[in-house]
């Protein structure tokens, strides 16, 4: 049925995985996410026979609820289009479902389920009371007018509003969903419900319930986590060459924070290619090109003396000490990792969700390269969403410095928890196993306590 080697799983876990494949045979991304978690939780399952007695693992891999709906909207010429919307409410053991909305042509149920499944454990690692979920639509905001995006968002929220709420399900942004889209959706929710429920969405504007540091959070948090990894190796970002794939929100603010800590970020990318800037990426120019003009990295290269744009090839061929994949799933293949290792990479930490292929992860670990999975290293975004929910509940707003300090502490704590759990289960230094074991244990123990629901 697939290339997954179930002989590496215990018989009980292999049975769970084969059931997932049998029920949803076409969901490759979801299978990959489940397999990666099951590979690492065997020692936990062995210590806790009650998990098997209560079918905890079987229940965790099955969403509590998955919604699919049509989203009709009219373009500026009056033509009607129909897109497909999704919301997977995966697990609410620890709190309201929490996870972003992705608007991209590639969106399908498999991708939303993989993201929602990862979100369960990522949210558990933050220490904040949040369950896991994810949603989105196969709509492409690129090339659309503001009015078209608004009409789509209003149609999308008209259906989604039936299923969300501050104590039920709290969506946020993701690829293709930024402050503009969150604003349009929040406005429609407020109009439909006749209530100002600030806590129903996160990633809001600062004047209407948003949090300082939310925009920066995923990128900053990634670098805070990577800095802890470097410190564990007796070093720091100071003087390091860094490559960051992507040039969206996560990549921009990871670049900014890494350079604040003394690193030189020498390359960023987008779907058109990558740019090499040996002097260090000019973050102000990158923000102007990507956030203001919504341009390409080739525009950055055209305006930045000494920068070189490369349309073909791989950004992973650029020599670096630290690699931060911040674009999309499965962007870092085995060939990319082999190039990184050949050029002496010391650390890889994920800013995107599942950007490194399973074969590439194994190659990194075999080579002794420190590697952090996204569920740990990119948890800063959802952590700060959780902080935004706290502020909304208290009808208050913290200063940037206070929120950033809380974010920093959360990332330090996630690192410590991941490392300690890996050591506890005999896999010291394995960040993948440590993160999976720590997150899974918290969710599973809570489900045991709550009974069969």
Predicted regions and their residues:
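Adenosine-phosphate binding glycine-rich loop
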Residues: 2-33, 229, 341-453
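General beta-strand structural signal in soluble alpha/beta enzymes
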Residues: 168-172, 196-200, 244, 267-270, ...
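Flexible, glycine/charged-enriched surface loops at secondary-structure junctions
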Residues: 28-31, 49-54, 127, 164-173, ...
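Structured beta-strand/loop patches that form or line metal/cofactor-binding pockets in enzymes
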Residues: 50-81
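Glycine-rich phosphate/diphosphate-binding loop of Rossmann-like nucleotide-binding domains
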Residues: 205, 210-317
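Rossmann-like adenosine-cofactor binding region
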Residues: 273-371, 376
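Glycine/serine-rich phosphate-binding loop and adjoining beta1-alpha1 elements at the start
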Residues: 104, 123-238
